[in-house]
Amino acid sequence: MVPQVSADPAGIIDYPRRLERNHLYFAFGGGVGRFGTNFTLFHLNGTTIWVDVGSGFANHHTPGMEKNLPNRQLLLGFPPTAIFLTHGHEDHIGAFPHLVHVIAAGTPVYTSPFTAALLTNRLRDRGVDPARWD
């Protein structure tokens, strides 16, 4: 059985303190059953790994929105210890430039040289210094 974790009634998100040690937890913050917003996290004993930080695409269900981002509660509740980006498609890296306030400077980002170049360009386009994650 997978334990379910929900936010405190006060809206405070502190998921990691509720999780048992020596148990691997994972969650999907998007990309399941639909195209876009690929985001998966793995958490074990205080270490959180994000795999992909993609954006979704606006459609007739989201009028007025330019992009969809991964689940906010997961992003804020589990800041990354490291990030792995599988490839450079927008649905796998597109949310990263919009989440720089959640991703601490110096957080290791592992990816291919080509994907790193794409991400660097997207960060610069938004006025963010990519050297924060070298």
Language-model segment annotations:
Residues V32-T37, L44-L85, G94-T107, T111-A117, ...:
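Pre-active-site segment of Zn-dependent metallo-hydrolases
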Residues I13-P16, F28-G29, T37-N38, F96:
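Generic recognition of flexible, low-complexity loop/linker segments
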Residues M1-A27, H43-G54, T115-D134:
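Metallo-beta-lactamase
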Residues D91:
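Acidic Asp/Glu-based divalent-cation binding sites
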Residues Y25, P108, R132-D134:
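Conserved beta-strand segments of alpha/beta enzyme cores
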